[in-house]
Amino acid sequence: MAYEKYVKLPGSERQPMPGATQAGSLDPNQLMQVTVGLRSRAAGSKQTSLDKLVSRGERLSRDEYEARYGASPADVQQVEIFASAHGLAVAQVNPAARTVILTGRCENFAKAFQVQLARYECEGSFYRGRTGYVSIPTELRGIITSVLGLDNRPQAQAHFRIAAAVNSASVGALAATSFTALQIAKAYNFPTGLTGKGQTIGIIELGGGFTQSDLNTYFSGLKISPVPTVVAVSVDGAQNQPTGDTNGPDTEVMLDIEVAGAVAPGARIVVYFAPNTDAGFLDAINQAAMDKVNSPSVISISWGGPESSWTAQSLQSFNSALQAAAAVGVTVCLAAGDNGSSDGVSDGLDHVDFPASSPFSLACGGTSITLSGSSISKEVVWNDGASGGATGGGVSDTFPIPAFQANANVPPSRNPGNFKGRGVPDVSGDADPATGYDVQVDGSSFAVGGTSAVAPLWAGLLALCNQSLGKPVGYLNPNLYQSVATKTGTLHDITSGNNGDFKAGPGWDACTGLGSPNGATLLQALSASASPTPTPTPAPKPKPKPKPKPKPKPKVKPKSKATKTKRSNHGKR
């Protein structure tokens, strides 16, 4: 089939990374992989029904979600025909995620999507990039919603900070005030007598890896036996590959596993390894959310980047994937970033981290704690300055303020336009490297902080809650804001400190959200607010058209009397 007319794909415009320069052409035979996003088979009122279902906290099975809101076979076929016409192969179709993964030669992808691909250099590293818009045939307008992976720049950063004692000396020296994850859990009054048994915690990683020997050493040191089960899942060819560099992604991977595993040692931990690209990251979220084999009830993600670093099509695609996770009852805990109110962008504006800024994420900010014995005597916003890091937080310039934050007093954005956006974060926990978490990485022990630690901390807590409740808490945000947080003592309200442009105060704030957890009391509030598991409603069936009624023969009346015509209800529903 010949495709003659093309149109620009909305939201696909891309610019080189800041400071990047073009460094030559690409080998036209270089093999590539690209993820094509498709529209939902639901449109109009059906999409509205999904929005309402999610906001009410109702859940669908993964099969039900695919049947109602996945990609239609006809749309998938259209993309398959398009791929074949350009010498591209279909590597994977994920109807529930509404994605088709294509593989092929660089030259063929460039022609298929009317783009110029080139080699770029940025700060000593190279990536495949493009500029401008992706174009698609007019026949696929409205069917294709995104094309990710043509550009394979590193899309996200890990949100961990190694304690200063490690950076200034040798790895192996613990910070004076570091804690084990168990001590942190006790300080936050996590419920006892629960292990997360029967739950699966999904963790998404965009690099690095873990070793079983490190896990054995760490958990045996905490006297946790047996060692939690940890399984690696490959996404888009990425593998569990430790680098041996404690300043690299290995520390992120081990921090996430060790914190979640210490808090919920009875839970099964599944780590989804994916390439650090927009396509790889999205595919990992989709695979974890729709995983019918491992079925995680909670997902922890400690990677992200400023909203301004993403294309509009990426923001839309990731947000849809997180909404899908919410629809099937999966809580997604996301680190809010470690660079304060600027999120590391030096343009003088405020920025929030994405995907944490999605309204379908449980965005996790950071605090600094002081313990008296095993109890918290003081807790403030984590802010160690520009070099030491600070909790991310602020107001989204992309996502409107969601209904669950309508009464949270979220201020308008301080940026030009004063957009009334989604407030970040939702909750918080200890993230200061100076009061950090002891970890075991690549054979060494040291202390780590950052909001990277808070996401798995909350994921572990929610796994305990899910075990106790006998069902997943699922999309927590509406219930959290409108019910749970209104109960006295469920969260510690942090009222002191700032993250740059935002200050902490009573109630929700753009530094620590609603506050840090009081675990046992939080579980009680969740139990009290939990409604019976809803019976899945069948997919709506079209209403039968009413049979036309025979028209009565008009009666002849004298002309001198007024004639009344009965109004027919035929055709009304």
Stretches with model-predicted labels:
Residues 370-377:
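Short acidic, Gly/Pro-enriched loop/turn segments at secondary-structure junctions
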Residues 1-2, 573:
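Sec-dependent, cleavable N-terminal signal peptides
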Residues 2-93, 101, 106-366, 391, ...:
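Substrate-binding/charge-relay-adjacent region of secreted/lumenal peptidase catalytic domains
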Residues 368, 412-415, 462, 466-510, ...:
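An often Trp-containing, charged/polar helix-loop segment at the C-terminal end
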Residues 531-573:
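Ser/Thr/Gly/Pro-rich low-complexity, disordered linker/stalk segments of secreted
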Residues 507, 524-536:
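Low-complexity, Gly/Ser/Thr/Pro-rich intrinsically disordered linker/tail segments
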